[in-house]
Each structure stands twice: as structure tokens, then as C-alpha cells.
From Swiss-Prot:
This is Luciferase-like monooxygenase. It comes from Escherichia coli (strain K12). The gene is yhbW. InterPro entries: Bact_Lucif_Oxidored, CmoO-like, Luciferase-like_dom, Luciferase-like_sf. Gene3D superfamilies: Luciferase-like domain. Disulfide bonds: none annotated.
């Protein structure tokens, strides 16, 4: 359906199902990373979140190191590190260390959102407005260090300086798309939970892109959810765990990933249903035939260079099977 090569990648939040633990979530992430490597997923990213009892990927760089040490060829990275939470120097050192240990296998995806609530921001010892205002400068500083330039002649990250680590900008708004275009960096859009501005952002990024030493032409990744099973009914049942989690988030409730339920109408209100369905509208839920049809439409409409797949499923084996089926569909469509 397309002549260009389209990579297929995987996003992991290290979800903690109800009754489980962070330790089990890390074990499950390792299973998933090994599956991703075996099946040919191009890259495997982990997302930074804080103070969320159902997500274990807070110390993103540490978890990347754990997975890299237990795989061989898989590209691993952050999807993303929320840069306003951190000193650029510390991030350069952390990812420089990772790239020194696992050369050519590490990506740094950067986000501008806090990935946390206001109390957690204070616990992270940061001042939100100032740090967000500094985001373009902080990104440029990281890129300069990785490209062996000296934004500060008295400070260098060791390791990190000159490491040529791939840097991505992530976002769900026009801001990140514009900045990625201006800096000549690859861009990933978080349509798996905030799809509203997807097409505007892709157009803005592509039409304003300035070639750089890192990237000659725009490269856009689109992140979607895929919940695949052997039948549509089974997939829709598994999907209710994510739907419940999104409802609870909107209610201001915390908790681990809930088990699936038979009837969402007994769980959410009509307004909650509308909001969650909008947020999760870039979700392909069904058997291979249904997922294939949906993926064809997304590729045609977005002209994405890369698809990143997310999927939070309560049962670990069902989650592994879903990512197996997703790759089956990719191979059938794109080789």
C-alpha cells in the first residue's frame, strides 16, 4: 500500500495490574522487550510518569539500562523523559552512560509536559513555569553536547559529550511540532492519548521543517493503541482495562490497572464515555483483520514514517499475544 519503509515500534509504561507489584511489572517489561527484539520491533521506549500507582516507569533511564543489559540488538529509549523535571546536564550524563554501555542502541525522546500533578512537581524540586519556558534552550543544549559542541565552555557531560545520541521531540500539541521543525529533529505525536491536534501538528512539522546536521527531511512517528486478540469480542473485553483507567484518571482517582469488565456502560457516565472515547480514538481494537483495516487507514491518513504501538492489558500473556498479532499485521501489510 506504500513504497516507503515504515518502522514499527513499541511504547511501554510498565503498567502495574491490580494485585501485582512494580517488581512484576519490570519482569513483564523484560518479557515484552525480548518479544519486541525477537519479532523485529524497531525501537522500544519507556515513558516517564511520577506518583502514579499503576505505572512503574518513573526512573526511566534506570529501566532502560535494565532492559538493554538483558537484550542484544533492540533500540531502547525514553518516550519520553520530561525535560522540565531534570537538569539537562544530568540527562546528558545518564544517556551518555547508557550509550557508552550499549553503543548505538539508545534514543532520547524529550517531552515538555510534567508527567505529574502539582504536588509531585514540588516534590521533584522544580518551578514549572520557568523550566517549561527554558525547554527550547535545554533541548538545544543537549543536542550541542551530544554533537560535541560547547554551549557552556566550562561544563561537559562525561560520558555524553560527542555521543551522537538520537534526540526526538515528543508532544500532543503544535508547540512541540513547531520546535522539532525549527531544530531539524524527528517528531513523535502522542495520539495514543491526545489525538485532537494530530493532523495539524503533522502538517505544521512537515511544512516548517528545517534540515539539520541530524536530519535532512522530516521524520514523523505516530503513536497509537493496539489491543489485538483472536476475536473482536476478546479484544474489546481486554480494552476495558484501559478504558477504566482513563475514566479513573478523569475522576482524579489513582490506582493500578484494573481487570477487564463485561459492561462499561455500568462503569462510566455518558460524559465520561464521550471523553474517554475521544482520548482513545486512535486505538485499534479487534482481531487481525479489524486491526489491519484500521492500520491501513491510519497509514494512509497520516503518511507516518513510523508507528509506535502502546497497549495496556491486564493479563500479561494476553498483552504479549496482542503485540505478536500487531506485528503479524504489520508484516502482512508492509513486510
Amino acid at each position: 500500500m506504500t513504497d516507503k519503509t515504515i518502522a514499527f515500534s513499541l511504547l511501554d509504561l510498565a503498567p502495574i495490574p491490580e494485585g501485582s507489584s512494580a517488581r512484576e511489572a519490570f519482569s513483564h517489561s523484560l518479557d515484552l522487550a525480548r518479544l519486541a527484539e525477537k519479532r523485529g520491533y524497531h525501537r522500544y521506549w519507556l515513558a516517564e510518569h511520577h506518583n502514579m500507582t499503576g505505572i512503574a516507569s518513573a526512573a526511566t533511564s534506570v529501566l532502560i539500562g535494565y532492559l538493554a543489559a538483558n537484550t542484544t540488538t533492540l533500540h531502547l529509549g525514553s518516550g519520553g523523559v520530561m525535560l522540565p523535571n531534570h537538569s539537562p546536564l544530568v540527562i546528558a550524563e545518564q544517556f551518555g552512560t547508557l550509550n557508552t554501555l550499549y553503543p548505538g542502541r539508545i534514543d532520547l525522546g524529550l517531552g515538555r509536559a510534567p508527567g505529574s500533578d502539582q504536588r509531585t512537581m514540588m516534590a521533584l524540586r522544580r518551578h514549572m513555569s520557568g523550566d517549561i519556558d527554558n525547554f527550547p534552550r535545554d533541548v538545544a543544549e543537549l543536542v550541542d553536547w551530544f554533537d560535541a559542541r560547547d554551549p557552556n565552555p566550562h561544563v561537559r557531560p562525561v560520558p555524553g559529550y560527542g555521543e551522537k545520541i538520537p534526540v526526538w521531540l515528543l508532544g500532543s500539541s503544535l508547540y512541540s511540532a513547531q520546535l522539532a521543525a525549527q531544530l531539524g529533529l524527528p517528531f513523535a505525536f502522542a495520539s495514543h492519548f491526545a489525538p485532537d491536534m494530530l493532523f495539524q501538528a503533522l502538517h505544521l512539522y512537515r511544512s516548517n521543517f528545517k534540515p539539520s546536521a541530524r536530519l535532512e527531511k522530516p521524520y514523523a512517528m505516530v503513536c497509537i493503541n493496539i489491543i489485538a486478540a483472536d476475536s473482536n469480542r476478546d479484544a474489546e473485553f481486554l480494552f476495558t482495562s484501559m478504558q477504566q483507567a482513563f475514566v479513573k484518571l478523569r475522576r482524579g482517582e489513582t490506582g493500578q490497572l484494573p481487570p477487564p469488565i463485561q459492561n462499561m456502560d455500568q462503569f462510566w457516565s455518558p460524559s465520561e464515555q464521550y471523553g474517554v472515547q475521544q482520548a482513545l480514538s486512535m486505538s485499534l481494537v479487534g482481531d487481525k483483520a479489524k486491526v489491519r483495516h484500521g492500520l491501513q487507514s491510519i497509514l494512509r491518513e497520516t503518511d507516518a514514517d513510523e508507528i509506535m504501538v502502546n497497549g495496556q492489558i491486564f493479563d500479561h500473556q494476553a498483552r504479549l499475544h496482542s503485540f505478536e498479532l500487531a506485528m503479524d499485521v504489520k508484516e502482512e501489510l508492509l513486510g
